[in-house]
Amino acid sequence: MSSAAQPMSRRARRRAARRALGSQPGTSGGMVIPVSFVVSGATSADFVTYHSLYSRLAAYNGDLWIRRVAVRVTGSVAKRMGKYAFFEGLAVDKSQILSAAHARPYVYGLPSTLSLPGGRRQVKDFQSINLFFLLDGTAHAGEFAAGTFYFEFEGSPNVDFPRDSEGSNQAVEKFYLEHINA
């Protein structure tokens, strides 16, 4: 895990996630679980994509649904992030991100909340749903971002997330910056 991520107790992480999502415990009937990510090694690009195989979580609960995602990012790339949006697949250009009805501006240092296109989505759908950020300027090789996605779930409250190599009780997914040809 990146040194940028500060260790928090599970209870503190969930409180922070609920605040980021604007929901209070017990009001939504769902649950909030944070997933950390680290991205690095970009080639020159004016927008980036973060993606990972969240479909593997479906093996723990095929009826698990995601309603909203809050994003908090730090690092050299994060300071220049603009609008962001989810899309099916990777064939996306800048104009699609700018014009997407569900796109939101990213405010550095603050959690930004984004509802999924079409409402709630099953976790297994995330094998083809990717998050795109526009950048002010370009990302270069060696730049990085680190942070957390806070996922608001519907489904079983007893999902057993896989442990990372350090034995953490939160799932740690590796993301990467990738040059996308518009």
Curated annotation (Swiss-Prot):
It is found in: Virion. Transmembrane segments: none annotated. It comes from the Viruses. GO terms for molecular function: RNA binding. GO terms for cellular component: ribonucleoprotein complex; T=3 icosahedral viral capsid; viral nucleocapsid. Residues 1-25 are annotated as: Disordered. It comes from Olive latent virus 2 (isolate Italy) (OLV-2). This is Capsid protein. Capsid protein self-assembles to form a quasi-spherical capsid, about 26 nm, or bacilliform. Keywords: Capsid protein, Ribonucleoprotein, RNA-binding, T=3 icosahedral capsid protein, Viral nucleoprotein, Virion. Its main location: virion.
